[in-house]
A protein has these predicted regions:
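A nucleotide- and high-energy phosphate-metabolite-utilizing enzyme signature
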Residues: 1-232
């Protein structure tokens, strides 16, 4: 059917199949407005397994063809449901702390902790992206991109302009550094992890990495305060 052909076309274009099955060919990711409304409601109110991850993916979705109003309707229902409950948003946002405290990454950069590579996605990229996503959900921001969400959150006073700029610059730096590391691993025919060994970075790169992780640390403090994560 068309869903199968669409997925096959993506493969031909060079997009690998999603290991998690988040694809059009998967019936769990298709449905009517009513079906989707029930699905996202269950993800939010009765989270189990990968429910919150699926909810995060849905919040980043945007229409590329067809009637965009259908997606907008489901998203509006979700925003209405979520913003009526602070505990629900706090539970969703708690994932920013899933990979340990920033202190661990700082110790590695300063040579005070265990040696070894730093997982940039866990240390900085995910906390920025998901933290901004969570604040956007709390403030009913309809934008789906992190940069657009930061801009909207700064505009409505939710996020300090200086911190917003630092987060955006830090995100771009971390993503670039991770891409560079991944390409280097690929060139050496190693498994691509995108992890970075601080000892192999230049002095400038180490300083920029420290700045980025410092912004992440301060952003997490903002999230804990605004979304009351410490009382969940």
């Amino acid at each position: 059917d068309i869903c199968e052909r669409f997925s096959e076309a993506l493969t031909c274009f060079g997009y690998p199949e999603c290991k998690g099955g988040i694809m059009l060919r998967n019936a769990a990711w298709r449905g009517t407005v009513s079906e989707w409304s029930t699905r996202v409601r269950d993800w939010l109110l009765q989270p189990e397994g990968d429910s919150l991850m699926h909810l995060a993916i849905f919040l980043d979705a945007h229409a590329v063809a067809g009637d965009a109003a259908l997606l907008a309707e489901v998203r509006q229902r979700l925003l209405q449901l979520a913003t009526d409950s602070d505990p629900l948003i706090a539970r969703f946002a708690m994932a920013v702390d899933a990979f340990g405290s920033p202190a661990g990454w700082w110790n590695r950069l300063l040579g005070l902790g265990e040696e070894g590579p730093v997982n940039l996605k866990k240390a900085g990229i995910f906390p920025i992206v998901h933290g901004v996503r969570s604040l956007a959900l709390a403030r009913r921001v309809m934008a789906t991109g992190t940069a657009e969400r930061i801009s909207a959150l700064v505009a409505d006073g939710t996020l300090d302009a200086g911190l917003g700029q630092e987060l955006l610059q830090g995100l771009h730096f971390l993503m670039g550094l991770r891409l560079q590391a991944g390409l280097a691993e690929l060139a050496l025919k190693r498994e691509v992890t995108g992890n970075v060994d601080p000892a192999r970075l230049s002095s400038l790169e180490r300083d920029l990495l420290k700045d980025a992780l410092s912004a992440v640390k301060r952003f997490k403090a903002v999230l804990h305060h605004r979304l009351r994560l410490d009382v969940v």
